[in-house]
């Protein structure tokens, strides 16, 4: 809302009331935002002229269940989402944020038939943001001055290359 990066935001959910409620909540923040964005609950057909579709749907991860255990459940969910989006005439970019994110990004790539540069996964970007925030708290610096990344496959095999972490572009961790 505050970055004014789009003129329309459409929320699609199998639970239509939830999508409507979330769209209403976000819309109520518009009077305080520097944009005239339109926010609404919608249908897959609304994706026809979208530049970006963010997929964050999926089965919940149960206690003791690995991200890879989610694969079969989420494959079914993604099949029911990607096909109607493609059928709408969507010709933009997919951004995948559902676990297991790296594998689900490949699933969207396969199901959509889109070129690889139009199917992107969030990967370890959220983990990197969390790491940078925790480091900024620990070292009492602005998070924007922390340059550290989590790399690898999102999940149990990701890691931090500590020798590459920087604070204020001066201090090597």
Regions found by a protein language model. Give the residues of each.
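Short, surface-exposed amphipathic charged segments that create phosphate/polyanion-binding patches used
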Residues: 131-140, 158-167
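Conserved NAD(P)H cofactor-binding loop of Rossmann-fold oxidoreductase domains
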Residues: 57-59
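N-terminal Rossmann-like NAD(P) cofactor-binding module of classical short-chain dehydrogenase/reductase
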Residues: 54
């Amino acid at each position: 809302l505050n970055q004014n990066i789009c003129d329309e935001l459409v929320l699609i959910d199998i639970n239509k009331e939830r999508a409507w409620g979330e769209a209403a909540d976000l819309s109520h923040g518009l009077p305080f935002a520097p944009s005239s964005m339109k926010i609404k609950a919608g249908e897959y057909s609304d994706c026809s002229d979208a530049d970006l579709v963010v997929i964050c749907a999926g089965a919940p991860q149960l206690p003791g269940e690995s991200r890879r255990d989610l694969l079969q459940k989420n494959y079914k969910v993604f099949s029911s989402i990607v096909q109607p989006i493609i059928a709408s005439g969507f010709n933009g970019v997919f951004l995948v944020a559902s676990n297991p994110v790296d594998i689900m990004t490949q699933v969207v790539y396969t199901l959509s038939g889109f070129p690889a540069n139009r199917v992107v996964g969030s990967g370890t970007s959220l983990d990197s943001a969390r790491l940078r925030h925790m480091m900024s708290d620990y070292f009492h610096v602005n998070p924007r001055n922390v340059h550290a990344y989590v790399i690898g496959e999102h999940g149990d095999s990701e890691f931090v290359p500590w020798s590459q972490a920087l604070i204020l572009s001066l201090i090597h961790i």
